[in-house]
C-alpha cells in the first residue's frame, strides 16, 4: 500500500451498514467497510453476492435502502451518477460504456467535450477536436495505454483495446476513487499484465485509490491491499493481503469458512 495513506487518518471512503432491497429481494444486508487513500480494495464474491449492486450505490446509480456513505469524512447522498462523478468517483463497468462509432478522443471526452474559444465557438458549441485528440494522446501515453491513433473509431479496435480505453478514460478524469468492474475480463495475457501494472503504478506513484471487482483470485491477490468478501449480500470478511492467501479468500467466497463477523 502507498505510504501516502498512512498520513491521513480519515478514510477516503467509509461505507456503513448499507442495505438494498428490490421488492422482496434483499440484495445487500448491512455492508460496512473502509477504504484508505492510496489503497487497492478488491471486492470479491460469487455471482449474486451483491458486488455490482454495492458498486452502483457508491457510484450513484442506485440509492441505498438504508445506510450511509462517507467520502473524505463527508456524508454523501448520491442521487444520480453525475453527483458521484462530480465528487471524483469514476466507474468502468463491464459493458465499458463506449460509443463504437466515435473515435478514441470523443469517447474519452464523452460528456466533457471541449469547445473552441471565441464567441462563435462557444455560442455554436463547436468542438475543439484537435485539442481533445492531443490531450487524449498525451493522457493515454502517460498511462502507458497503447492505441493506434486517437482518431480511430472504437468499433475498429479489439476487445482489449476497448477495455484499455475505458480504463484510461476513468483514470484521466478520476480524482478520488476509481472503480473497475472486471477490468481484465476481455484481455489477453499481455494486456492483462499491462493493466495490472498500470493500476499498481498509479497507486504507488500517484496515490490513487481503487475498488476492483474481479473473479480472478490470482490477480486480486497480486494487486489488492485489502479484500472485502461478500456472500449472499452480506459482508463476511475483510482480509489484509499480508495476513491471508488465495485459499482463505476462496473459502470465504464459497462458504467453506464462516463469516468473520
Model regions and ranges:
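Glycine-rich phosphate-binding loops of nucleotide-dependent enzymes
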Residues: 2-261
Amino acid at each position: 500500500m502507498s505510504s501516502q495513506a498512512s498520513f491521513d487518518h480519515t478514510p477516503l471512503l467509509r461505507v456503513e451498514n448499507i442495505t438494498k432491497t428490490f421488492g422482496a429481494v434483499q440484495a445487500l444486508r448491512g455492508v460496512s467497510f473502509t477504504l484508505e487513500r492510496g489503497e487497492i480494495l478488491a471486492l470479491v464474491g460469487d455471482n449474486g453476492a451483491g458486488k455490482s449492486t454495492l458498486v452502483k450505490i457508491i457510484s450513484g446509480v442506485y440509492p441505498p435502502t438504508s445506510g450511509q456513505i462517507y467520502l473524505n469524512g463527508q456524508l454523501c447522498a448520491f442521487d444520480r451518477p453525475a453527483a458521484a462523478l462530480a465528487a471524483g468517483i469514476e466507474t468502468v463497468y463491464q459493458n465499458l460504456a463506449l460509443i463504437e462509432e466515435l473515435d478514441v478522443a470523443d469517447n474519452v471526452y464523452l460528456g466533457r467535450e471541449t469547445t473552441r474559444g471565441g464567441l462563435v465557438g462557444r455560442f455554436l458549441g463547436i468542438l475543439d477536436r484537435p485539442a481533445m485528440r492531443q490531450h487524449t494522446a498525451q493522457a493515454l501515453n502517460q498511462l502507458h495505454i497503447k492505441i493506434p491513433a486517437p482518431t480511430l473509431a472504437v468499433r475498429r479496435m479489439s476487445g482489449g483495446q476497448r477495455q484499455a480505453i475505458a480504463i484510461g478514460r476513468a483514470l484521466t478524469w478520476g480524482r478520488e476513487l476509481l472503480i473497475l468492474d472486471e477490468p481484465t475480463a476481455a484481455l489477453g495475457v499481455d494486456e492483462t499484465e499491462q493493466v495490472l501494472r498500470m493500476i499498481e503504478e498509479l497507486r504507488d506513484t500517484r496515490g490513487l485509490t481503487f475498488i476492483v471487482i474481479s473473479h480472478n483470485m490470482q490477480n486480486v491477490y497480486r494487486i489488492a491491499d485489502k479484500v472485502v468478501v461478500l456472500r449472499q449480500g452480506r459482508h463476511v470478511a475483510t482480509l489484509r493481503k499480508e495476513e491471508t492467501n488465495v485459499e482463505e479468500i476462496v473459502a470465504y467466497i464459497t462458504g467453506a469458512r464462516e463469516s468473520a463477523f
